[in-house]
């Protein structure tokens, strides 16, 4: 489960995490925290220290995307994997993140990093630096479908028995260009989605939805 943790009062954020931690106690659930680069370095560090006991899979975008040194500082001071990259759109930008040891997990967005081809280049570069890749997934059902195919093809970063496989970020908020755009929408069942195996991305666009939302 990914939690968006953005707020001005540290005590409120702490209480929120305590409630979530209590609700998920003894359950087979992994938590990720996304702060959408809401904080400066010092506040992100304080929050990160408070989050360490929750054994997070990752701490996403703790500072603004441009603050590469800030990412690196947090990564060196926290015992939580640092994730980022959804707002980085070029291979050269990701190269800078990797060279500065700024992130543990790269999150290119297939819809804005050059599509499937661009994502493949970023994935190969990330793995050459030993960086895990877990794409950011947002937007339309077409972006979802492309992301699912890419995620399914990503090899484990470290070839070992206990290597982690990437997971699909699956937003369930109301969005007509996700549910209504496909003739057969994706269905989440027990935390899993079947990977389409038809031609192309494996999906069929609902043309009635296109007509409904088109503008002249």
What function would you assign to each model-found segment?
Residues 49, 55, 66-192:
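Shared catalytic-loop signature of beta/alpha-barrel
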Residues 63:
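Phosphate/pyrophosphate-binding betaalpha-module
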Residues 36-41:
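Short acidic, Gly/Ser-rich segments with clustered Asp/Glu that frequently serve as metal-coordination loops
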Residues 13-33, 70-84, 131:
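Alpha-helix-loop-beta-strand connector modules within alpha/beta enzyme cores
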Residues 1-7, 11-12:
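Single conserved hydrophobic/aromatic residue that forms the stacking wall/gate
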Residues 175-216:
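C-terminal extensions of enzymes
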Residues 13, 17, 44, 67, ...:
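Aromatic/hydrophobic pocket-lining residues that form the small-molecule binding cavity
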